[in-house]
Structure formats: C-alpha cells, structure tokens
Swiss-Prot record:
It comes from the Bacteria. The gene is cpcC. The lineage of its organism: Bacteria, Bacillati, Cyanobacteriota, Cyanophyceae, Oscillatoriophycideae. This is Phycobilisome 32.3 kDa linker polypeptide, phycocyanin-associated, rod. GO terms for biological process: photosynthesis. It holds the Pfam family CpcD. Keywords: Antenna complex, Membrane, Photosynthesis, Phycobilisome, Thylakoid. It is found in: Cellular thylakoid membrane. Residues 1-179 form the PBS-linker domain.
Length: 290
C-alpha cells in the first residue's frame, strides 16, 4: 500500500492495488487483461491504436507459447516502443523511462544510468532492454508471470527513499501519459542524479494542485489576469489558468517554467484561443483561490 496518508492528494492511491498476474489455467479474458496491463505499463499509458498492436506477440502469449516476461520483452523491444520513446529522446531520458516501464522505479544514482548508457552504446538497444528484464531485480519482483508495476510508492526490501521522491518527477498521475507531459522530451532526473541530490515531492496537476506540475522554486506566479482587469460581473466566476511555453514577439522572453492567469468563466473560451495563438500550452484550469 502507499506509504503516506496523503496518497489520494499525491496521486498514488490508484496504484494501491494487487499486481496483474497470469495464473495457471487462465482464460482468454485473463490473457487480454494481462495484455492491456502490459501495454499500459510498458508504453507509459500512451494510447495504442488497433493498427499498432503487436498482434503476433499477442497471439503467441494468448496461446501460451511465451510468458508474461517474454511479452513484456517483445513490447519493450518493438518498433512501436522505439518510435514512442527511443528515436525522439536523449538517451538519459530513455533510460529513465526504461527503469520506470520495466522495473517500476526511478534510477537510484548516476552509476545506474552510466551502466545502461555504456551497454546501449556497446551492445545495442535490445541488449540493454534484456539487461532490465533478465536482471535479478526483475525476477525477484515480477518473475515470469507478473506484469511490471510502479513499486516506488510501496515499502520493499532494498528500496531507497530517493526512488519515492523521484518517481513523482516521472509519474505525473495515474491518467497521465509519458508522452503527454509539459516537460516534453527533457530528462527529469539528469541534473539531480549528477548532483546526487533528491527533488521535492510534487503532486500531479489537478483541481487543487494545478501549480504543482513544476517545482515552486522555478515557477513565476503573477498576480494579474490575462490582458489586465478581469472585468467581473456580479455573478461571474474567475478560474485559474496555468500555462507553459508562452512565446510571441511581444511577450517577454524570460526563463520561466510556467505562468498563471486569472480569467472570468464568461471569457474563458476567448482567452484559451488567445493562449493558443501565443504558443502556450494549458497545464490546468481550476477555480481561483484553490
């Protein structure tokens, strides 16, 4: 179970569930449940279209020719995985994701990242993936029949505290996708791994935690609405719009992770269009004052 009473607020409550395991004498429905769980975990909850599914590997698994571990391997070494996570990312980001997808945790130190970086450069991507799946850690936690899952939110022998805090930088909520985060393709942990430091726990964005998708030290929180005064009527409501990546010729080019604007609900649609024209990305919308 999650190790904190703030599990629901931090977004870890959804992970308080039994691992998905394929047992003996399984049905076809049981196999499909495992297949869905593998896609969700190994592909970082990214959407998989019907045309992208690994039908050959699914068939081998459903008919008992390969184990859960081998199906995980097939997905992680597939062209689908490479297109989603390898080709468009720096290798440090790829290694972060491999740890999360295959071992269910974040890297503990820079030495782990260097080890996998060397293996990737000298032996190739498939060999590096095999090193996760064939490791003693994978065998001890998942064996041949359990789908990998996020382990950083539970107390286990051999766990380090840094894994708990760092997972909040990699896992941005149960419904979030690893390819749909505000930080994009940037490494989440490279800086703190190099410094041997740990990041503060930052909960996922939500109605009450909208500003939390960036660490507070890097954020800029202006106390004004978008375009000046809100122009409220007596019964109008103001919402808080959190925006990243604003970039226009008339907008100040200052290194800020995000900005917050306060907008009346009656003008929200208009302002969202304006934000889009300014190149911004909306991170969250929540009632003002929360």
């Amino acid at each position: 179970m999650p190790v904190t009473v703030a599990a629901s607020r931090l977004g870890t409550a959804a992970f308080d569930q039994s691992p998905v395991e394929l047992r003996a004498n399984y049905s076809r429905d049981d196999a499909q449940t495992v297949i869905r769980a593998v896609y969700r975990q190994v592909l970082g909850n990214d959407y998989v279209m019907s045309s992208e599914r690994l039908t050959a590997a699914e068939s081998l698994f459903t008919n008992g020719f390969i184990s859960v571990r081998d199906f995980v391997r097939a997905v992680a070494q597939s062209e689908l995985y490479k297109e989603k996570f390898l080709y468009n990312n720096f290798q440090t980001r790829v290694i972060e994701l491999n740890f999360k997808h295959l071992l269910g945790r974040a890297p503990y130190d820079e030495a782990e990242v260097i080890e996998h970086l060397d293996r990737y450069q000298n032996e190739g991507f498939e060999a590096d993936i095999n090193s996760y799946i064939d490791s003693a850690e994978y065998t001890e936690n998942f064996g041949d029949n359990i789908v990998p899952y996020i382990r950083s939110y539970v107390v286990q022998t051999g766990h380090r505290t840094v894994g708990f805090t760092r997972m909040f930088s990699l896992q941005r909520g149960y419904a979030n996708s690893d390819r749909a985060q505000i930080a994009g393709n940037a490494s989440r942990l490279a800086q703190e791994l190099a410094r041997n430091t740990t990041s503060a726990v930052v909960g996922p964005s939500g109605v009450n935690e909208g500003w939390a998708f960036r660490s507070a030290a890097d954020d800029y929180h202006p106390g004004q609405s978008l375009g000046g005064s809100t122009g409220l009527s007596a019964d109008d409501q103001v919402v808080r719009v959190e925006v990243a990546a604003l970039s226009t010729p008339r907008y100040p080019r200052i290194r800020r992770s995000s900005r917050v604007f306060f907008v009346p609900v009656s003008r929200l649609s208009q302002k969202l269009q304006e934000i889009q024209r300014m190149g911004g990305r909306v991170a969250s919308i929540s009632p003002a004052g929360q």
